[in-house]
Curated annotation (Swiss-Prot):
Part of the 50S ribosomal subunit. Forms a cluster with proteins L14 and L19. One of the primary rRNA binding proteins, it binds directly near the 3'-end of the 23S rRNA, where it nucleates assembly of the 50S subunit. Belongs to the universal ribosomal protein uL3 family. Keywords: Ribonucleoprotein, Ribosomal protein, RNA-binding, rRNA-binding. GO terms for cellular component: cytosolic large ribosomal subunit. The gene is rplC. This is Large ribosomal subunit protein uL3. The keyword rRNA-binding applies. PROSITE patterns: RIBOSOMAL_L3 (PS00474).
């Protein structure tokens, strides 16, 4: 069954394996999540649990009422986790980092850093033109396509807004679980800026 928890990206550091190997890790702070709702096929058409992380500062009345059913404070970051055995969880139950163990493979979903308006070279990894004297083509997008269609086809790599998108990194290994400080140490990097919210779930392709 799927396991999942919400957390906050703290940053990156490195730890040493028993054989002395240096492992770069991302530290994710995952304070106990609260189960806010259980969704069933009868009432919602599918099965899932809704979990919340981090108390909201200025909740509205609907959010307050929804959280009150779980006897908790309104949450700022709320997500649904599918594929969970509903018999094993109850509304108001806390989910902590011990859900996972060292060696587990997980998928981490976050929002990538916003880069603003960027050109085709940075945004689409295009090659630039020659920078030598006489060249009139340096960092431009290149050909817009053939003349005959009288238009630019969809999908043409052009400048535009970059980043700020939901991205999932798959099959990342959990190196260490720190129950005392509610920390998950995940091998490699995960999307998002420091202090951004991330979702950690069991790997789909593991």
């Amino acid at each position: 069954m799927t396991k999942g928890i919400l957390g906050r990206k703290i940053g990156m550091t490195q730890v040493f394996a028993e054989n002395g190997e240096v492992i770069p890790v991302t530290v994710i702070e995952a304070e106990p999540n609260i189960v806010l709702q259980k969704k069933t096929v009868e009432s919602d058409g599918y099965e899932a649990i809704q979990i919340g992380f981090a108390d909201a500062k200025k909740p509205n009345k609907p959010a307050t009422g929804h959280a009150a059913k779980a006897e908790t404070a309104p949450k700022r970051f709320i997500k649904e986790i599918r594929g969970v055995n509903l018999d094993e969880v109850e509304v108001g139950q806390a989910i902590n980092v011990t859900t996972f163990a060292a060696g587990d493979l997980v998928d981490v979903t976050g929002t990538s850093k916003g880069k603003g308006f960027q050109g085709a070279i940075k945004r689409h990894n295009q090659s630039r033109g020659p920078m030598s004297h006489g060249s009139r083509y340096h960092r431009r997008p290149g050909s817009m396509g053939p003349v005959a269609p009288n238009r630019v086809f969809k999908g043409k790599a052009l400048p535009g807004r970059m980043g700020g998108e939901q991205i999932t990194m798959q099959n990342l290994e959990i190196v260490r679980v720190d129950e005392e400080r509610n920390l998950l140490l995940v091998k490699g990097n995960v999307p998002g800026a420091k202090k951004s919210y991330v979702t950690v779930q069991s790997a789909v392709k593991a």
